[in-house]
Amino acid sequence: MADAVTSQTLADGDRIAVVKFTNISDGTGESSVEKVDISALAASNAGLTPALATIEQIWYDVGGMRVALEWNATTNVVAAVLGGSAAAGNVSGHMDFRSFGGVKNTLASGYDGDIDLTTSGHTNLDHYTIVLELAKNY
């Protein structure tokens, strides 16, 4: 079996994209799974294709596992870690990074602008719901 996962684009405008991810785990988890394909996001009104995204806000509810959001690169770089542990139960919150310009891609060797996700400490029926607000960079 495999984790039951969904990805949904809630908004995809000229400057901002909002995406939502869910997972109900069967205990197998996810490892560096592409969640945001930057090249699949809508082009700007001027016809430019986005090259990178900056994480402006994160809303999350994580139960029983940890979730790492990663900048895809030759060796992925962790952008944020959400959740806690099975002992912590559900951990939810909102992180707003707009006051300082957001969490920017580190441009590590081999970066491509995509955002990946890795879970750890997952067991059967652990779960997450994550919403990202991304600013597109052209």
Pin down the residues of each PLM region.
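Solvent-exposed, flexible loop/coil segments flanking beta-strands in beta-rich domains
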Residues: 1-47
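C-terminal interaction-tip segments
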Residues: 3-13, 119-138
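Repetitive beta-strand solenoid architecture
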Residues: 15, 54, 63, 109-111
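Short, surface-exposed beta-strand/loop "edge" segments at domain boundaries and coil↔beta transitions
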Residues: 24-33, 66-68, 77, 120-130
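Beta-rich globular "head" domains
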Residues: 34-71
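Short, surface-exposed beta-strand/strand-loop-strand elements in extracellular ectodomains
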Residues: 64-84
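An anionic, turn-rich surface loop/hairpin at beta-sheet edges
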Residues: 78-102
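Noncatalytic modules at the cell exterior or secretory-pathway interfaces
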Residues: 101-127
